[in-house]
Structure formats: structure tokens, C-alpha cells
Regions:
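Core AdoMet radical
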Residues: 1-46, 55-66, 86-90
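Auxiliary Fe-S-binding modules of radical SAM enzymes
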Residues: 51, 63-135
């Protein structure tokens, strides 16, 4: 089973986590849309209740550029990674989003880069073929 919609982590209870544990889950997706919501205790509780141990099967949609700053977006991404979740950045109004937000999306959603380069500050999206890419 693959839950592709972003479930509300706050609604996970021991009972429905037990039900999830009884089915074969390909991937479960949660959402952390509002940076003002402190969802860390809920994500920790799910880890305790769930038998899903592979971080790639615990994905969290992170909504960026919708009343959030770059720092808030980066905080949620780094926090989720530290907790053992796989963040996936979604940008509201992408064509008008700040360049740094689009770079963060490219960094986070390209898993080869994300798991190879430990920090966003070390990621240089303009670096092409050993030379800085001119725009």
C-alpha cells in the first residue's frame, strides 16, 4: 500500500499505527505545511509506534514559499532528516519563488545530491563540469 497523500501526523494514534503495522506499506507520506506548527513530538511518536524502519518509506511533504522563510524551510528539512524521515520539498507559486527556495527544492528532491552533500550550504547548484556555470 502506498499513501501518496500527505497524512496529518497529529492524527496518528497507537490504534491507527497498529493498523498501519498490519498492512504492507510501500511508502507513507505526511505533510508539514505550516512552519509555525511544532510537529517534532508527533514525528517522534510515529517512529516509536511504527514498524516502518526504512527512512525512504517515511516521506514528508514540506510546503515552502507559503508564508515561510528560507530559514524555516531549511529547518524543517534538516529536522526531518535528523529524525529519520525523507523530506520532499514542494514550492507554492514556484515561478515567483525566490531563487534560494528553488535551489533548496533541487537539493532536497534530488536524493543522490541530498544524501551525498550533507548540508545545503555546501550545495552549489551553479557548479557545472568543474567550473562555475555562467547564467
Amino acid at each position: 500500500m502506498d499513501f501518496t497523500q500527505g497524512l496529518d501526523i497529529r492524527l496518528i494514534t497507537p490504534d491507527n499505527a497498529a493498523l498501519l503495522n498490519r498492512v504492507r506499506v510501500k511508502t507513507v507520506h505526511f505533510a508539514w505545511d505550516n512552519p509555525d506548527d511544532d510537529l517534532i513530538p508527533y514525528f517522534r511518536r510515529f517512529l516509536e509506534l511504527s514498524r516502518i524502519k526504512d527512512h525512504r518509506k517515511r516521506r514528508v511533504y514540506v510546503l515552502a514559499n507559503y508564508g515561510s522563510t528560507h530559514e524555516q524551510d531549511l529547518y524543517r528539512v534538516e529536522t526531518l532528516l535528523g529524525l529519520g524521515y525523507d523530506p520532499y520539498l514542494m514550492i507554492y507559486d514556484r515561478p515567483n519563488a525566490p531563487r534560494i527556495t528553488r535551489q533548496l527544492q533541487r537539493y532536497v528532491n534530488n536524493k543522490r545530491i541530498f544524501y551525498t552533500v550533507p548540508h545545503f550550504a555546501d550545495y552549489a547548484p551553479d557548479w557545472k563540469g568543474g567550473k562555475p556555470h555562467e547564467n
